[in-house]
């Protein structure tokens, strides 16, 4: 199980990403406009740099909702491989069957 502080830090990052999503998209769209001059583009870039570092979606890390484990993450379930295996064996994941061929 991951430390509670790491899980909370990740939740804080998710809140920051949501809070600044619109502003970040607007700034990036304005910077991508080919009709603006270089000085305006530099000003937009400076505004983008002033946003909190943790508000960038790149800094998010997928974590298991059950254990908080950051590695071996399955997006379809939101679980790490260990929790996925355990829950599948118990029959807690609908539609998941043990493979045989």
Curated annotation (Swiss-Prot):
GO molecular function list: rRNA binding; structural constituent of ribosome
Range of residues in the leader sequence: none
GO cellular component terms attached to this protein's record: cytoplasm; small ribosomal subunit
Pfam family, one: Ribosomal_S14
Keywords: Ribonucleoprotein, Ribosomal protein, RNA-binding, rRNA-binding
Gene Ontology biological-process annotations: translation
Organism superkingdom: Bacteria
Keyword match Ribonucleoprotein: yes
Family membership noted in the UniProt record: Belongs to the universal ribosomal protein uS14 family.
Subunit structure and binding partners: Part of the 30S ribosomal subunit. Contacts proteins S3 and S10.
Function: Binds 16S rRNA, required for the assembly of 30S particles and may also be responsible for determining the conformation of the 16S rRNA at the A site.
Name recorded for this polypeptide: Small ribosomal subunit protein uS14
Originating organism: Synechococcus sp. (strain JA-3-3Ab)
Taxonomic placement: Bacteria, Bacillati, Cyanobacteriota, Cyanophyceae, Synechococcales
């Amino acid at each position: 199980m991951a430390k509670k502080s790491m899980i909370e830090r990740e939740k804080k990052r998710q809140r920051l990403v949501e809070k600044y999503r619109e502003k970040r998209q607007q700034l990036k769209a304005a910077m991508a406009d080919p009709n603006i001059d270089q000085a305006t583009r530099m000003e937009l870039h400076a505004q983008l740099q002033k946003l909190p570092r943790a508000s960038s979606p790149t800094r998010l890390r997928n974590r298991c909702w059950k254990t908080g484990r950051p590695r071996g993450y399955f997006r379809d379930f939101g679980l790490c491989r260990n929790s996925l295996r355990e829950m599948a064996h118990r029959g807690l994941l609908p539609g998941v069957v043990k493979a045989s061929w």
